[in-house]
Amino acid sequence: MAHVITRINAREILDSRGNPTVEVDLETNLGIFRAAVPSGASTGIYEALELRDNDKSRYLGKGVQKAIKNINEIIAPKLIGMNCTEQKKIDNLMVEELDGSKNEWGWSKSKLGANAILAISMAVCRAGAAANKVSLYKYLAQLAGKKSDQMVLPVPCLNVINGGSHAGNKLSFQEFMIVPVGAPSFKEALRYGAEVYHTLKSEIKKKYGIDATNVGDEGGFAPNILNANEALDLLVTAIKSAGYEGKVKIAMDVAASEFYNSENKTYDLDFKTPNNDKSLVKTGAQLVDLYIDLVKKYPIVSIEDPFDQDDWENYAKLTAAIGKDVQIVGDDLLVTNPTRITKALEKNACNALLLKVNQIGSITEAIEACLLSQKNNWGVMVSHRSGETEDVFIADLVVALRTGQIKTGAPCRSERNAKYNQLLRIEESLGNNAVFAGEKFRLQLN
């Protein structure tokens, strides 16, 4: 029996930062299937377009009524009557025909908005899973051509100290994460992470005062830390105090594009201070040396966006220097875009993809980006955005694609824990048919 789309309705809802975002209800004979899209704060310039209204009289210009109108008036009429199991056909219709906008990196979604297209793409996935009478993660695995007899549960990369554009402190690097690779299961990994998180809170309170334990957009703490060493020392202390030395490692998201000066090709590690300390302005080569020193001193297993999104040369230098032992992840560099991934492969610029579905704007293209990366023996980390919703789609996606790693914030704030809690449910439902990635989070688990 064909399960056709009978109705599509989009609405404007609020994300975790209080900004508007797009939610879609898609109806078939099996019921209503809902999806909501996230949005980022530190966005890469090569991301597909997130359509905002720019009407300063509503939500300070951040409204998404244009995207809503595009769904209700342009996309919905074309999709009604189509079979919800035709994911690729529907995504291609939206991206290539109804939108059709392109730039040098592929389909840019600048006409209808990636936020409009993605919301429908996700809702279609949920409807397709119901039509096939399988869970969303099993259906996504089928779409990706992955085996679904034994699924992989990811290591959670929990963002517990915030800096960069996500925080009001002086810390230039954006995220410091704890990675419980030594746990025997996802459930235990989450427990390790939560215990380290609470231990860290006590350490911060002791050292910086009670008001230093306020949390940022992703649930991490943002004490008035001045540099990366100070943050890493705090993490090492918290991990040790919680009893998980050797079992919990560290990952960083530098988000270096946020403090890169393209005119003189330097990185300002004091970019949040009006009269910055000139000794903290570094060349790319000096930054390479800084990362090498940090990796020698601390149990760092992954570094994301260590350089600007166009600094291919220094990416390649760092990957050549430490890529065997440390995952070098491209986020702003790659923006989940198969064309950018291909360029990075040619230049040996990094060895892992950060997979953000809203950077590329459709589930079909996100799967393509993942498969291209895995085919070339890269790691893949599925990721949230700093402006999130209660939608848990990425929890199912990470299990389906067998990537072995996910970052979706600290074990704090409901829009973050919603994803972790969904992974707990998935692990429970799979029972013996689940394997936890653990120490092998970088390896091919396909």
Swiss-Prot record:
Binding site for substrate: 166, 175, 304, 331, 383-386, 407
Gene Ontology cellular-component annotations: cell surface; cytoplasm; cytoskeleton; food vacuole; nucleus; phosphopyruvate hydratase complex; plasma membrane
Positions of Mg(2+) 2 binding: 253, 304, 331
Residues carrying Phosphoserine: 42
PROSITE patterns: ENOLASE
Keyword Membrane in annotation: yes
Record keywords: Acetylation, Cell membrane, Cytoplasm, Cytoskeleton, Glycolysis, Isopeptide bond, Lyase, Magnesium, Membrane, Metal-binding, Nucleus, Phosphoprotein, Ubl conjugation, Vacuole
Temperature dependence, free-text field: Optimum temperature is between 20-50 degrees Celsius.
Molecular function as annotated in GO: actin binding; magnesium ion binding; phosphopyruvate hydratase activity; protein homodimerization activity
Effect seen on changing residue 108 to G: No effect on homodimerization. Decreases catalytic activity without affecting affinity for substrate 2-phosphoglyceric acid. Loss of Mg(2+) binding
Cross-link entry Glycyl lysine isopeptide (Lys-Gly) (interchain with G-Cter in ubiquitin), positions: 138
Motif DKSLVK motif, residue numbers: 277-282
Necessary cofactors: Mg(2+)
Location within or outside the cell: Cytoplasm; Nucleus; Cytoplasm, Cytoskeleton; Cell surface
Cross-referenced InterPro entries: Enolase, Enolase-like_C_sf, Enolase-like_N, Enolase_C, Enolase_CS, Enolase_N
Sequence positions that bind Mg(2+) 1: 42
Group of enzyme by EC: lyase
Record PTM N6-acetyllysine, positions in chain: 133, 375
Function recorded in the entry: Glycolytic enzyme that catalyzes the conversion of 2-phosphoglycerate to phosphoenolpyruvate. In addition to glycolysis, involved in various processes such as parasite development and invasion. Plays an essential role during ookinete invasion of the mosquito vector midgut by mediating the interaction of the ookinete with the midgut epithelium and, further, by binding to mammalian host plasminogen in the blood meal, whose conversion to active plasmin promotes the invasion process.
Domain comment in the entry: The pentapeptide insert motif is required for the stabilization of the apo-enzyme in an active closed conformation, independently of Mg(2+) binding. The motif is also required for homodimerization. This motif is only present in Apicomplexa and plant enolases.
Protein family membership: Belongs to the enolase family.
Subunit (UniProt): Homodimer. Forms a complex at least composed of DegP, ENO and HSP70. Interacts with G-actin. Interacts (via the DKSLVK motif) with mammalian host PLG/plasminogen (present in the mosquito blood meal); the interaction occurs at the ookinete cell surface and is required for ookinete invasion of the mosquito midgut. Interacts with A.gambiae EBP; depending on the Plasmodium species, the interaction is either involved in ookinete invasion of the mosquito midgut (P.berghei) or is dispensable (P.falciparum).
Classification via HAMAP family: Enolase
Protein name: Enolase
Organism: Plasmodium falciparum (isolate 3D7)
